[in-house]
Structures are given as structure tokens and as C-alpha cells.
Amino acid sequence: MPRRKKKIKEASEGQNLEKKDLETTSSVSIKKKRRLEDLFIVISDSDGEETKEENGLQKMKTKQSNRSKCLAKRKIAQMSEEEQFALALKMSEQEAKEVNNQEEKEEELLRKAIAESLNSRWSSDASAARPRPLSTGPSSHPHQDSTKDSGTTEGIWQLAPPSLCKGSQISQGNEAEEGKEPWDHSENPEEEPLSGSSGSQDQSSRPVFENEKVKCFDRCTGHLAEHTQCGKPQESTGSGCAFPKAVQGRGDTSRQCLPTPADTKGLQDIGGTVHYYWGVPFCPAGVDPDQYTSVILCQLEVYQKSLKMAQRQLVKKRGFGEPVLPRPPFLIQNECGQEEQTSEKHEGLSEDVRAGAREERQGSGASVWHSETKDSQKSPITSLKQRLLLEEEPTTGRGQSSQGLFVEETSEEVLKSSEGDDAVPASQSIAVLTSKRDLVLMPEASTEEVTVCPETQLSSFEPLDLNGEDSVDGREIPTELGMTVSNRQVDNREAGKDSRPPAVSASARVSCPLCNQDFPPTKIEQHAMYCTGLMEPETVLTRRRREAKKKSDGRTAAQPALDISRKEKCYLCKSLVPLGEYQCHVETCLQLANVDRENGTEGMRRPRVCAPVEGKPKQRLRKSKEKGHSQGRLLSLLEQSEHRTTGVERTPKCSEAGAFRMPSPDVEEAGCSRERQSSLSKLNLNESPIKSFVPVSEATNCLVDFKGQFAFRSQTKSGRGRRRKS
């Protein structure tokens, strides 16, 4: 049983497929019939009367379509989903193809219909234009040709200006097929070569011209140009005219060619008339077309000329300025000098002042000072200038060393010139020099100065005030020391200046134990801090180091002298000591403590009264070496005192402290003087104070445990990290 059912199903499916094929073929044939019927569309001027045959065909079409729809519905109902889907795809593809083909055919039919209507209109225009005269000449013989387009008609084909008929040619060129054929012209020297191109028509509607002479009229120049036309010209589809086109192309719309016979007198009588043709522009009703087109051409010419004028005004070439070139600094200084010259003229200064200022500005570096020393003998202005500069220089630090190089030569000449010469008032010269001070020093400021270290040069020409230095530093300079002291005077560079008193009569100087050079007492400590033991006659000082020296000198000078009245507490004897005597007092206390430690209890009973030294003021030791040793001993004694205070040794310490408090100030002064003499005798000048320095990491007597401190911090940090993680 099931086998028979399968066979029946297969047979039914085969029948269904055959029916579908028949339906598709019938539908295709019906559509083809529709296309054929559509092809036979006739464009006519009638109102579209329908014939009886068309009505019968439409009835048959409707019946067949209804039948095919019913059959298709039945077949689709019997088909499976996959078959229905495949059938739908096929049907959609076929419909799409049919629609595309139908659209293409309709477009072709429309083009043909438009071309036929245009051909019929051209024939009517040609017949209407026959009685219209185109020129007022005595003879006009236009060429005629017979064309065959639904009848034989005769027309006149004329050359029209390209500016008038260009728009119609473009608008109608898309609808008809176009072709191009060259024109050959014999050139006139007054006219540019022309070439024409126009839309092509069918061979039946194409007129033929052979060896026709055409004359073109140029409105701009007013000349006529003859051209022989060979070959087969083509007419435009819009107006039935062949248009020449300018190849060289100036954009000139006023050039045009007029149709003329072989005789040239007719065109000369016409002059500048413009013939109007339908198309472009469309002339309004009631207006002469020739006048209308001539007005439009004039407007185009005016517009073109105004446009060119505007473009010429817009484009203007701008001149370039002078190039900006880098200039060396001396040129800039010369310009500054020129500006100053103008300002000096307004101020009414003399010519010698300006000459001296120019000469001084041109120098740079060390040459400035040499030129000043030479010019100081000639003009008093330069000497006053040097005097002002010397007064402005600071008296401490590098100021003394820089002044000592040139002041000795010019100091006497300044005085002589200031007394002898009174040509220029002093007030004016000083004002001018103060205003120009910065410009004189410009070359020095531009380059980094290379100065000589003040410690390696002689002292300044001013006498040293020992009492003043003591008050500034808060210390006392020893007058009689068991050290190498040399008394030097400033060397005079000129032999005639020996009678002048020396700048420094007898100044105490201290020699450095490393480099064996002499320095004043106020400079030896600063030199010892940076001394390396090498002989450096000249050291380079940068601006930063000079500024640092200035600041340090200013700080030492700004220390108040009232620091002497301050009192500090001695941690050995527990007594208040003036600040000036504190160091000496501490040293004596330490020495006494060492002696007591060696001799036992005898040191406490021994009187500490020393014979006073008469005729000597209060003095102190200033060696930084002893400072380092005393600091180390002070720390050790502090540790011992802390150990003694705990336990049995507390009472003797108190008695010892009481013994230290007892002595009077006179006794302490005597002890200080005696200990100072003994310490001076034991001084070794070959040892530098920098050698006694002990770094913090190697200090054994220090109370602070740096290693333990660091370990404790690391433990705390690790503990914090663990807490945060938890």
C-alpha cells in the first residue's frame, strides 16, 4: 500500500510541475504580447480613439489572467514550502528582468518619438522662414536643399552666432545622438581660427554645402573675415543652424558669424545688427527679438569687463621688507651708542664727553680697564667714572681683589685731574656717568667673568681696623701669636709713587698649612674650608659662587655687636659665661678636668688661680682644629658625667660642680690667658683643621644611634604594610 501511495504522489508532483511550466510559458507569452503591443504606440495629434480590436484584446487578456491566477493558486496550494520558496525566487528574478527590459524599450521609443517631432518642426520652421529677408543687400542667394522626412520640404540653413544658440544646443544635445566633424578654414590675419561642432542628424535630414564662402563679423574689431567652408557641416538640433566654436577661447561672447551670400556689400550695409533665433534667450512678447538679444550681449560684455577689473584690483603684489639678520653684540652696542648721542645732544653735553663714552663702549673684558687707565690722563670725565665705579664696588670679598688690580695706578691721577681741570661741571659729569654706568659694563655682563680668587691676592688698599673686625665677628684677634706672621706692603707699579704711603702698613696675616699661602685673619677660615693643598694662583669664580660669597659676607657684617653681652651656660661647671669668652672658658674647663682625671683627687684640691697677665687684652683662639677636638672631648665628658650622676659618684660630682662655680671672673681670666699661651706653644701649623673632621657614620662618641633608628623605622613600615594587608 505505501508503495502505491508514493507512486501516486510522484505522478501528481510531475503533473504539477508540468502545469507550472505551462503557466510560466503562457505568462511569458502574454507579457511578450504586451511588449509587442506597447511597441506599436503611435504618436499622433488625434484624441486617442480606441478601435474595436483593442477592446476585444483587452477582454481576452483579462480572462486569461484570471485563469492563470486560479491555476497558479491551485498549484501553489499543492506544493511544499521549499518548492514555493524556489518558485517565488524564480518569479521575482523574471519580473525584475522584465521590468528593466520594458523600461529600456520605453526610453528608446521616447527618444525616437522626440526625434521625429523635432524633424517635423524643423521642416515647418524652414518653410515659414522662406519669405523673411535676412539682409538688406542687393542680392541674396541662399543655398537650398531638398530633405525627405514624411514629405519633401525646402528650407534655408544659416550660420548663427554661437553665443545665441549655445543654450539650445546644450539642452537638446542630450536627447539626440551627437557627432563631431571638423571644419577647415582659411585664416585671415585679423581673425582667430574657428572650428565648429554641432549635433548630428539622420542622413536624410542632413544638408550638404560645398566650397561655400562664409563671412564672419567681429563686433569688437569691426572687421570682416572670409572663410572657405569645405566638407559637410552639421546643423544643431535646436535651430537648424551650424555653429562655429572658438578654439583659442578668450571667453568673448560678442563674436558672431552672420549668414551672407558671396557678395560682401550686403553685410557692410547691415553693420552690427543681431539676428534673433528661437531658443536662447526667449524673447518676451511684444519686444523686437533683435534688440532684445543685442541688449543682452551688451550686458554680458559690461559684466565681463567689470569682472576683469575687479580681479585686477584684488590681486596686488606686496613688496617684501628688509631681511632680519642676526647681528653681533658690538653692533647692538653701536646702535645703543647712536641713541645715546641723540639724547646727549638734547642735554647739551660737550663733544669730548661723547668721544670718551664711545671709546669706552667699544672695549670688552680686560681691555676696558686698560683703555680706562690710558684715557684717564686725557679727560677728567673718565677718571670721575672710575671713581664712581670704585665707590660702588663692595669692600669685602671679591671687591677688594678686583679693585686692587687697577686702583693703584689711577688714584693719584683722579685727584690731579679733578683738581686741575674744571672744564665740565662735576654735577653734570657725575649725572651722565651714573646714567651710563650699565652700558659701560655691558660686555662684562654678557660673558661670564673670570676673576681671581681673593685669597691668592694682596689685601685691599684700605687699612684694616682690628677693633671693627672684632666687633663684627664677635671675636678677638690675637696681637702676638706664635705663628708665621708676615708684614707686606702693596707693590707700586710706578717708580714715582714710592713716596706715597703704603696701603697696608703692617697687617697680620696667617699662612695656610696646606698650600702655604698667607691670608688675612678674616679669610683664613673660609679658605681652609675649600683648600685642597694645591697651588692655585688663579681660580675661576662663577656668578653663583660670587653671589654666595656676597651673601655670606653680608650676613657676617650684619651680625649685631651686642652678641657679646649674651651669656651661655657651661655644662661642666654649670655657670653662665659671656658669649665672647665661652670658648676659652670651655677649653680651660676641659683641660682642668683632664688634669684632675690624671692626678685623681689632687686635681680637685689644687687651686686653679693663675697669675694674671698684665698689659694684654682679652683674646681667644680661633683655630678650627681645636674646635673639632674640643667638641669630641665635650661629648665624652658629657657621657662620663651622666654615668657619675647615677649611683655613688653623685655626691662627689656635686662637690666638683660646686668647686667649678666658685672661682671669680678675675681668676678665670688669668686661667684663660695662661692656658692660651700653653696651647699656642703646642700648636702644629702643618695640620689642617679639615683633617679633624669625623663623619657621622664613623662617630663613636655620638649619643644618637643612627643604625638602630633606621632599623626601627623599617620595622614600623613593614608592620604598617602587614596591618593594611590584613
Curated annotation (Swiss-Prot):
It comes from the Eukaryota. A motif (LR motif) lies at residues 60-78. One of its GO terms (biological process) is DNA repair-dependent chromatin remodeling. Residues 194-205 have a biased composition (Low complexity). Zn(2+) binds at residues 512, 515, 527, 531. It is found in: Nucleus. PANTHER family: BRCA1-A COMPLEX SUBUNIT RAP80, UBIQUITIN INTERACTION MOTIF-CONTAINING PROTEIN 1. This is BRCA1-A complex subunit RAP80. The gene is Uimc1.
